[in-house]
Amino acid sequence: MRSALAIAMAISMSAATTAWAQTAQTPAPAAAPAPAAAPAPAAAKCDNPNALGVARVVEIDTTGGPGFGFEHFKAYDFLRDHEVVLTFDDGPWPGHTTAVLKALAEQCTKAVFFPIGKHAGWHPEIMKQVAAAGHTVGSHTWSHKDLSKLNEQDGKDEIEKGIAAVGIALGNQPVGPFFRFPALRHPPELVKYLGERNVAIFSTDMDSFDFKMRKPEQVIASVMKKLEKHGKGIILMHDF
């Protein structure tokens, strides 16, 4: 069995609105081995009585490469009502990732990061900060190519090189067996390959589309509207 940790937060809609509004105002200052389980986040004292916090830690059995996120996968759902998982793609990146880490720390909560391999190689010190803060680290290919436009072997190479690069950036530490496809495009042959590798696939329930919006308030309003509709879910954001 392969397993890794996802962080589920139980939040009220009003608390999330307040907390995310505060967060948005923070200025931005050869193939890999089979992934092993990510370390459990270290417990830390929270000095913010109004923080979002963490409701529970979910251990996910990744045997067979299950898919999560109702945008593409309907069979599995590990969240309870009023729980969300915060996920961040495309980092690590100076200013952006560090601002996200600061905001998460202020809210005493955790997230799942899906870094791009070459970005991790450029900024291993930031990658180590992500892991040291107790967040779960998966992978997001080597260079964020649309894998649906590559042949099968090139797609596998993108996946494996990305996993390896993140592991090296972490100081040759295991990478959690979680993967997100670039642009959320899932070639069937690579879905099958990840299943054979026992790597879980993360799609999303709520895409923030933060890369399309200039104002934090717009992102907050969009996410909260979707959260009010669905009541729970995996939220996709970016730290690049």
Model regions and ranges:
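Active-site beta->alpha N-cap acidic-glycine motif
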Residues: N48-D154, K161-I168, N172-G176
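Terminal accessory/targeting
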Residues: M1-V85, K102-A111, H230-F240
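Homeobox/homeodomain signature
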Residues: S3, A10, V58-T63, M127, ...
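Active-site-proximal beta-strand/loop segments in catalytic clefts of secreted hydrolases
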Residues: F88-G91, F114-K118, T141-W142, R180-L184, ...
